[in-house]
Amino acid sequence: MILAPISAIYGLCRATSLTLLSVFTLHQGCASARVLGRDGVQRMAANEAVEVMNWTHQPAWLAPDDREIWMDRCVQQINWDQPQVRVYGRWHRVPRLTAFLADQQVAYRYSGAVHRGEGWPDWFRPLLDLVSSRSSAPFNGCLFNLYRDGQDRMGWHADDEPEIDASFPIASLSLGSSRDLQFRHRVSGARCDVSLADGDLLLMDPDCQRLWMHGLPVRKRVKQARLNLTFRVFRSVD
């Protein structure tokens, strides 16, 4: 078990510009996002919170005082791990720290290992209930990824494992430093970068995982930690 370093100060930054490729239909704008086409054409648009494509981005969803409280609680009270994955016959540690909380009936295969729910600690239930209420989803599992600085990352993937009930949305809560979450359309290859800052909530609707891949690239200038909590509805196992 590898534990995360505890930092007393989490650096925060928020990008406010938005560039959009005209071929996309935006419902009400996209907060702090860049959408790029293969030709590199960009358009500027207003910085507003709202639904774009197959996800909804709500900046500053969590109150400022609550952000610091939940960041500190999660970093200090969760047992962090840095699992290994086998790539081309060699074992490598994933470039981030991870943890998993869930109902006891839940099992989830992630990063080459099966994670089994052991129930929810009392201290975490208020946040679970808050996110579930906002998302109108009965979340029964949460995956934690702690990016210690801008060197930690996540490759292209979709949260489409068979254990996940794809009829419900996935809620992603960001705490700590800002990072760009990249989306890539599975068919067209179009890209969209969404800047997620401290306290932001991203709701990915059921079609998002089917239509888009996403990942978190390296950002060498980021020196502080970012914590991402993704709440999901899992199919229970006997």
How would you describe each model-predicted region?
Residues 20, 24, 35-238:
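Non-heme Fe(II) oxygenase metal-center motifs and adjacent flexible, charged/small-residue loops
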Residues 1-2, 11, 19:
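Short N-terminal alpha-helical targeting/association segments
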